[in-house]
A protein has these predicted regions:
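Polar-ligand-bearing catalytic/cofactor-coordination segments
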Residues: 1-19, 23, 28-37, 43-199, ...
Length: 233
C-alpha cells in the first residue's frame, strides 16, 4: 500500500505543478486562442499527452520519492548479519526471476511493512520496515520479500503508470470542462478566462484526482493477490 500512496501523492503533486505552471506561462490562453477549449477532441489529446506525461514523470521519480518520504536507509554494503542475509535473499530471488538485483533498504516504522518501487524491473527498490525486522522470523521476512519481488518481476509499477496516465487524462479533461462551464455559464465571463476558471480547474483536479485514485487502488489490490501467489511460488 505504501508504494501506491507514494505514487498517487507524487502523481497529484506533479499534475498540480504542471497545471499551475501552464497557467502562469499563459498556455491556457494559447489553447483558447486556437479553439482547443471548445474542441473536445483536441482537449482530450492535450489531456492524454499531459496525463501520461505526468504519470511517467511520477514513475521515474518513484524510487527517489519513496526514499525521501519513507526515510529509507539504502544498504549498499551490509554491516551486520541480518543485512548480509537480506541481500543474499534478494540476490537469490533476483536470479530465479531473471531480473537485475534491486536496491534494498530499511525504513523506520513500528509496524511490519514493506514495499517495492522503481521505474522498471531492472531499476527498482525493495524496502522493509524496522518493525518487520523486529517482529517476524526470517522465514516470514523472506516470504514478504518474495511478495515484493513478484511486484518487480511482474512490472506492476509500469502497468500502474499506464493506468494512472489514462486516469490523469480524464481528470485533466473534465476539470477543464468544469472550469469552462463555471467561467462561462455561472460567472458569465465572455472575455478570456478569469481567475474563477483557474481556481475551479485546480480544485476540480484535486477532487477528481482523489476520486479517480480509487480505480488505481482497486487495480493495485488485484496485483496484490497476484503478488501473493508469486511470493508463495
Amino acid at each position: 500500500m505504501k508504494r501506491i500512496l507514494f505514487f498517487i501523492v507524487t502523481n497529484i503533486a506533479i499534475l498540480l505543478v504542471l497545471s499551475i505552471f501552464l497557467s502562469l506561462i499563459g498556455f491556457t490562453g494559447i489553447l483558447q486562442s486556437n479553439g482547443i477549449d471548445l474542441d473536445y477532441d483536441s482537449l482530450m489529446l492535450f489531456s492524454l499527452v499531459f496525463g501520461m506525461g505526468g504519470s511517467f514523470i511520477s514513475l521515474y521519480l518513484s524510487k527517489w520519492m519513496a526514499k525521501k518520504m519513507a526515510g529509507v536507509q539504502v544498504i549498499s554494503k551490509p554491516s551486520n548479519d541480518f543485512e548480509k542475509w537480506y541481500l543474499q535473499v534478494v540476490e537469490r530471488q533476483s536470479s530465479i526471476l531473471n531480473i537485475k538485483i534491486p536496491e534494498i533498504g530499511i525504513f523506520q516504522s513500528a509496524g511490519p511493512n514493506a514495499f517495492a518501487t522503481g521505474s522498471s524491473k531492472n531499476n527498482s527498490l525493495i524496502a522493509i520496515s524496522s518493525g518487520l525486522v523486529s517482529n517476524m522470523s526470517r522465514n516470514e521476512i523472506e516470504a514478504v520479500i518474495g511478495h515484493e519481488m513478484s511486484h518487480v518481476a511482474n512490472g506492476d509499477m509500469v502497468t500502474l503508470a499506464l493506468i494512472q496516465g489514462i486516469v490523469n487524462a480524464f481528470v485533466i479533461f473534465f476539470s477543464r470542462v468544469i472550469g469552462h462551464f463555471v467561467d462561462r455559464v455561472i460567472l458569465k465571463n465572455e472575455r478570456g478566462y478569469g481567475i474563477g476558471y483557474f481556481f475551479t480547474v485546480i480544485f476540480a483536479q484535486v477532487v477528481l484526482g482523489i476520486l479517480a485514485s480509487t480505480i488505481v487502488m482497486w487495480y493495485s489490490r488485484q496485483r496484490e493477490y497476484r503478488a501473493d501467489y508469486g511470493g508463495a511460488m
